[in-house]
Amino acid sequence: MAVARHGCPPWGSILGLLVLALAAAAAWDVSFLRCSLGSFCECDFWPDLPGLECDLARHLAGQHLAKALVVKSLKAFVQDPAPSKPLVLSLHGWTGTGKSYVSSLLAQYLFRGGLRSPHVHHFSPIIHFPHPSHTEQYKNELKSWVQGNLTACGRSLFLFDEMDKLPPGLMEVLKPFLGPSWVVYGTNYRKAIFIFIRWLLAVWHHGGAAAGCCGPLPPPPAASCAPLCAQ
């Protein structure tokens, strides 16, 4: 009859596991510290530019110049620890060329929550600004919304869809946030990203101005497809 023998505990294995656990904890602490002190982990901001570049190359047919400009602008902005201006991107062109698709990819690869991130704010003229007669009210609401969210998190993304359908005048309240000043209304906004879709007289790069729009605020996620041009 075989007798089962209980050997000594495998201390080598236990010590090995303990070392691995301590190493993992130390790595987590370093990562957490880097996220706490650095700019890359602010407010759900977790940019994956290689992933974005790969996805654009695989799924956005044509638009090579536009893709290159988007990636180049984002790289320069994200890698700058203290940008002098917010990043302003204007995606414009005919329906079906990828504007909305690109904007949804930007949110997906810049924020861990994508379009559902509390720091990604998507505005639609039909949903948020439906009544041109309420433009003055919309101006006050939009200014307060942008200012409040930038105060809570400088790494915020503001996406304005269908700019051509916005009543004139609303976007004027954004001009102070798009310029070279360091602080607006007591808020540091230089790490923010503004994306304007389907606005023909667009400006592309750090800084710019917009015009025309209206509506109430909380941000609904959404995305579709349209043409992309860079200027």
Swiss-Prot record:
Signal sequence bounds: 1-27
Compartments where found: Secreted
Reported tissue expression: Isoform 2 is ubiquitously expressed.
Key word Glycoprotein present: yes
Gene Ontology biological process terms from the UniProt entry: positive regulation of calcium ion transmembrane transport; positive regulation of gene expression
Residue sites binding ATP per the record: 93-100
Carbohydrate attachment residues: 149
GO cellular component: endoplasmic reticulum lumen; extracellular region; nuclear envelope
Key words, A-Z: ATP-binding, Glycoprotein, Hormone, Nucleotide-binding, Secreted, Signal
Molecular-function GO terms, alphabetical: ATP binding; ATP hydrolysis activity; hormone activity; identical protein binding
Positions of the pro-segment in this chain: 28-189
Main subcellular localisation: secreted
Pfam (any one): Torsin
Function (record text): Salusin may be a endocrine and/or paracrine factor able to increase intracellular calcium concentrations and induce cell mitogenesis. Salusin may also be a potent hypotensive peptide.
Family, similarity comment: Belongs to the ClpA/ClpB family. Torsin subfamily.
PANTHER family: TORSIN, TORSIN-2A
Protein name, as recorded: Prosalusin
Species this protein is from: Rattus norvegicus
